[in-house]
Amino acid sequence: MRHSPRKRFGQNFLQDKYIINEILRAINPLADDNMLEIGPGLGALTQPLLQKLNRLTAIEIDTDLQSYLTCLPVSQGKLNLIPADALTVDFCQFGPHLRVVGNLPYNISTPLLIYLLKFITCIDDMHFMLQKEVVERIAAAHGTKAYGRLSVMLQYHCEVEYLFDVPPEAFEPRPKVDSAIVRLTPHRVSPFESVNTEKLENIVAKAFAMRRKTLTNNLKGIISLSQLNDLGIDGGKRPEQISVAEYVQLAKFISN
């Protein structure tokens, strides 16, 4: 199919057979899996997935691609295509033990990752191709430059595995940046205390609002220096020096 990639959807189509096989190996789809693909595009992953699965749900926003995907011989009786923007979908409607995969458009990857956390109780695992810089941010340890809001929120909810890099030449058209594959597995037994997720997201967003300022400055009016000291948290540190567990402590304190 001749399809002109649409900039507004951030479309770059995966072409490289070796990379496709490596992604499939990482996902390891089993026939009865409850699997959902976000942004199937021209079906580079969709077609080999359908060959292994009894059924696949896919969410695609592009009307031209919707028609193309439903007409694929391998789709017949197996592909449940949802014509929608993934940022508007209730993922829990597809049942429990959902396995989510996708080559996520660069322009919506961060908001989509945060959005998916709302449905984490329905999800078994997620495998995504993302801009390499985004995967580095997700996997970053505290005290590093890449560590930020995305690192805290995703590591609170999931075990993060940075799997491998994907070069620009694996795509058509070639993106200007490298990509990478990440596996996100929701914690079945969390290493962190349970906390109100909205409170955590709010405190993390405020803490990272100005990265060069100290935690005390960024959280002024929310928590005092003496209260931070009582929690054993150094208010003189910058936000990227505060661990996920410490952000959980802060969110818990504010919730109370």
UniProtKB/Swiss-Prot annotation:
Under the heading Pfam families, the entry gives:
RrnaAD
Please provide, in alphabetical order, the Gene Ontology terms of the cellular component aspect for this entry: cytosol
Which coarse location class applies to the principal site listed for this UniProt protein? cytoplasm
Q: Which InterPro entries match?
A: KsgA/Erm, rRNA_Ade_diMease-like_C, rRNA_Ade_Mease_Trfase_CS, rRNA_Ade_methylase_Trfase_N, rRNA_adenine_dimethylase, SAM-dependent_MTases_sf
Recite the UniProt keywords alphabetically. Cytoplasm, Methyltransferase, RNA-binding, rRNA processing, S-adenosyl-L-methionine, Transferase
Binding-site positions, S-adenosyl-L-methionine: 12, 14, 39, 60, 85, 103
Q: What class of enzyme is it?
A: transferase
Q: What residue intervals traverse the membrane?
A: none
Q: Which reaction does it catalyse?
A: adenosine(1518)/adenosine(1519) in 16S rRNA + 4 S-adenosyl-L-methionine = N(6)-dimethyladenosine(1518)/N(6)-dimethyladenosine(1519) in 16S rRNA + 4 S-adenosyl-L-homocysteine + 4 H(+)
Coiled coil residues, start to end: none
Which EC numbers does the record give?
2.1.1.182
Q: What is known about what this protein does?
A: Specifically dimethylates two adjacent adenosines (A1518 and A1519) in the loop of a conserved hairpin near the 3'-end of 16S rRNA in the 30S particle. May play a critical role in biogenesis of 30S subunits.
The text of the family note is: Belongs to the class I-like SAM-binding methyltransferase superfamily. rRNA adenine N(6)-methyltransferase family. RsmA subfamily.
The name this protein carries in UniProt is Ribosomal RNA small subunit methyltransferase A
